[in-house]
């Protein structure tokens, strides 16, 4: 199967090609056709299966026809990191369209988010708590929403957000809309939620991401957020660290890290959704040829990267889910070779790190810096 067979708008196929996507993943191949046609979807799919594009491509396809500058699609996500990543996918996949969007979440000022909501955006990605904060004010209107996505619904359940989700869905009014629910697992509370808000959904089950590659040595470095760049520069001074694929959570952090490394005398470049296809191709070619020692990447931009002899993967920023960790670190130790996966862990990321240890099925050795 190719993306061309999914009957998506030509501008979306152009973006898919520019991102280097060749064939849809199983969840994309199963979910995109019914979602494109307006059906409700209930998908059991974990992070790392390509689920974000599975709902974002149909959203963009459907919204290309119709009104602008009014919120027509709402994506709810459990964490601000995931919301930011979904919005990055939205930008990358919608790069050749005029559809606007934004992500709103806690931990940052509300004023820029208020401005975006007043101006009007077609696609709104939000965490439940911050969205409810905005819904207390008249500028936040969701009466035009036609499509709703609940992403990682089981994580929202674990974090206690389900009552907030129900309040938000109830505030959308009785108008018929398309609803898609994605969840790695389907506990009873999620099944009940689906029964209450989805109408005759297409049910999709996708196998979880594969187990960690056997040849990877996993280590972790506890570090303060401001100490990450000095730590990476220190690691790069070691002779066994030949080349590094470093992952950040956002494209802006990828830019900043590549700049900091270059200033530190390290040959580095970055790839992410805001870089042109020519820029990404040039950076990857230079990395494979050994002209770059570090390639900084976001998860979406790194899809499909295969570098022979990659010595180290560095999780400069913690992945958003254990499955993402497995996909990231599997890029080293290819073809039965050995490789190293190094994760920087800030005090705020301890809980996420423990989830990763469960995913790799063993404790990860921590190295304390002196």
What residue ranges belong to the model's regions?
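Conserved helicase RecA-like core
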Residues: 2-370
């Amino acid at each position: 199967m190719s993306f061309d067979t999914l009957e998506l708008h030509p501008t979306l196929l152009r973006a898919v090609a520019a991102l280097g996507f060749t064939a849809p993943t199983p969840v994309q191949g199963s979910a995109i056709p019914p979602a494109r046609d307006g059906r409700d979807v209930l998908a059991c799919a974990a992070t790392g299966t390509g689920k974000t594009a599975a709902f974002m491509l149909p959203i963009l396809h459907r919204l290309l026809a119709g009104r602008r500058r009014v919120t027509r699609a709402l994506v709810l996500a459990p964490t601000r990191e995931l919301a930011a990543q979904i919005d990055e996918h939205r930008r990358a996949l919608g790069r050749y369209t005029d559809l606007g969007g934004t992500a709103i979440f806690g931990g940052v000022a509300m004023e820029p988010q208020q401005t975006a909501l007043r101006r009007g955006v077609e696609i709104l990605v939000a965490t439940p708590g911050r969205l409810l904060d905005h819904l207390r004010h008249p500028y936040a209107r969701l009466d035009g929403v036609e499509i709703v996505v609940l992403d990682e619904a089981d994580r929202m359940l674990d974090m206690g957000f389900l009552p907030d989700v129900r309040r938000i869905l109830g505030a959308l009014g009785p108008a018929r809309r398309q609803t898609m629910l994605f969840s790695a697992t389907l506990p009873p509370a999620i099944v009940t939620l689906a029964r209450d808000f989805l109408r005759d959904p297409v049910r999709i089950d996708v196998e979880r991401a594969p187990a960690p590659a056997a040849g990877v040595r996993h280590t972790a470095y506890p570090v303060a957020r401001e100490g990450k760049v000095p730590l990476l520069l220190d690691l790069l001074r070691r002779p066994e660290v030949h080349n590094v694929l470093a992952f950040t959570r956002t494209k802006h952090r990828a830019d900043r890290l590549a700049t900091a490394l270059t200033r530190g005398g390290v040959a580095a470049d970055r790839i992410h959704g805001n870089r042109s296809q020519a820029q990404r191709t040039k950076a990857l070619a230079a990395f494979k040829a050994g002209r770059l020692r570090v390639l900084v990447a976001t998860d979406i931009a790194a899809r499909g990267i295969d570098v022979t002899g990659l010595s180290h993967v560095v999780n400069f920023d913690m992945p958003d889910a254990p499955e993402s960790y497995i996909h990231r670190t599997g890029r080293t130790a290819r073809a039965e070779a050995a490789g190293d996966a190094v994760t920087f862990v800030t005090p705020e990321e301890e809980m996420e790190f423990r989830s990763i240890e469960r995913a790799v099925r063993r404790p990860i050795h921590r190295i304390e810096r002196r």
